[in-house]
Design a protein with these regions (language model features):
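Glycine-aromatic micro-motifs
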Residues: 2-146
Length: 146
């Protein structure tokens, strides 16, 4: 059965609310991070992050491009299709290959919807960069008591 490598950085991480979708997946690298600092991770305000390619986010001190921290899984076709459905690929999030530091490339889901990207660019107060750039789990720990 064909397998696909997927890098997860938000609600699909171990212990978070969408991780159950990976119940048949094999964890192959944790922690893991993207090889290049070319992403911006912001809080959606709804319990999950938006990851954008740096060129789709407004550059500012609070939104400097960074690597993304997460986990890499090996998934089958059916699980990849479930993830595509969750992420509304290709209209809401777009699945693309990205390099993983010290490892083989993996699929990643990046915010694609232009209206949402425009809202993120236009309202950094509503969509703040995560407290530790690229690290959703640390951000959750910092915001849990607020």
């Amino acid at each position: 059965m064909p397998s696909h490598r997927v890098f997860v950085y938000g609600s699909l991480l171990r212990g978070l609310h969408n991780h159950h979708l990976l119940h048949t997946a094999k964890l192959t690298r944790a922690p893991a991070n993207t090889a290049a600092a070319e992403f911006v991770l912001v809080d959606s305000g709804s319990g999950y992050p938006f990851a954008l390619a740096a060129d789709r986010a407004r550059a500012s001190d609070a939104r400097s491009p960074s690597v993304l921290l997460g986990e890499v899984y090996e998934v089958n076709d059916a699980t990849l299709a479930q993830l595509d459905t969750l992420e509304c690929h290709p209209d809401w999030y777009r699945r693309q290959l990205t390099d993983i530091e010290g490892d083989e490339p993996a699929w990643i889901y990046l915010m694609e919807d232009e209206a949402q990207c425009a809202a993120i660019r236009g309202d950094p107060t509503r969509f703040p960069a995560v407290a530790v750039p690229g690290d959703w789990r640390s951000h959750l720990g910092r915001t849990a008591g607020k």
